[in-house]
């Protein structure tokens, strides 16, 4: 059985985009704005594109989206709203690359 290979390289989110997403989450739901640790943010944003021996550690778009969610939530770079931001970043990455989550608000929560 052959594996399905993406025809194009996904578009990844840059730090400025993620900071805007975080700001929107804080404005909408409340919390303390700001970055607690820039290094943790940079590390989390590098994970979806991480390689080992020229092989992607997260080779599929779904694994890359999961990497955004996991690393932003588990290594919290922001003062507040880390899990909310992680979910919103994952959703933005998927949308940027032509995918949509099919979840109710209750399922997403």
Question: Where do the model's predicted regions map?
Answer:
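FIC/Doc superfamily catalytic core
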Residues: 1-109
